[in-house]
Amino acid sequence: MTMRTATITEFSSSYRSLPGLLHLLQFGDSALPIGGFSFSNGLESAIQQNLVHDKETLREFTLTAMNQAATSDGIALLTAHRAARADDRGALQVIDKAVFERKLNEETRLMTVRMGRKLCELSASIIDDRLNRDWLECIKTAETPGTHPVSLGLAFAALDVDGRDAFGAQQYGVATTILGAALRLMRVSFMDTQKILLEATSTVAPAYEEIADAGIEDMASFAPMVDILAAVHVKGHVRMFMN
């Protein structure tokens, strides 16, 4: 009888966490229909300029992009997640505008608002949450830009996913976007990209600890090469991706 009770308790605990895990898998999936496959996070230009040309330079590019995202969009995600849980709509608009203003080039701005709007449309349709529906109306009426990290923070808050896991899903998305694009743009194998992904995901927990308590005023990104590559990409004649 004791053994049976313990087993049931273990299962109950596992079942309570299972929905959150599945929500993470769904909203962290690169196949989520919000247009992420159309963007390469600057990889296309990096390859054209021969800055990325083999698996080692691809690894360095991926880790750099994740680090940059952690201190910019990652902080935005966490602050938006906290604001959503507090139903602080004024704070959400401040965060959203701050994200948009820190995107220095046309392509990164296009990427964040296009994916952000698509994600909010999806969330408002499939999650029973008033804040997500109201946020979509704010985007449609141009009251707020509707950036991706803010929309992601709102979705995960509505699904009761905690901030640490939400940050992990975002970082995973950055890595898989780049590595998925790499398979279409350069000579690299699935084995190579999976090895890079395994290493990259091991950096997420330390990155979270560094920015867990950061506020929107701490959001920063210094990656001039990324901005230069984006500018080059805008004028490119042959492009597979939108950025």
UniProtKB/Swiss-Prot annotation:
Q: Which keywords belong to this entry?
A: Chaperone, Cytoplasm, Nickel insertion
Endpoints of the signal sequence: none
Query: Where is this chain's protein located in or outside the cell?
Result: Cytoplasm
Main localization of the protein?
cytoplasm
Q: Give the quaternary structure.
A: UreD, UreF and UreG form a complex that acts as a GTP-hydrolysis-dependent molecular chaperone, activating the urease apoprotein by helping to assemble the nickel containing metallocenter of UreC. The UreE protein probably delivers the nickel.
Sequence similarity: Belongs to the UreF family.
* Official protein name in the record: Urease accessory protein UreF 2
Q: Which organism is it from?
A: Brucella abortus (strain 2308)
The gene for this chain is: ureF2
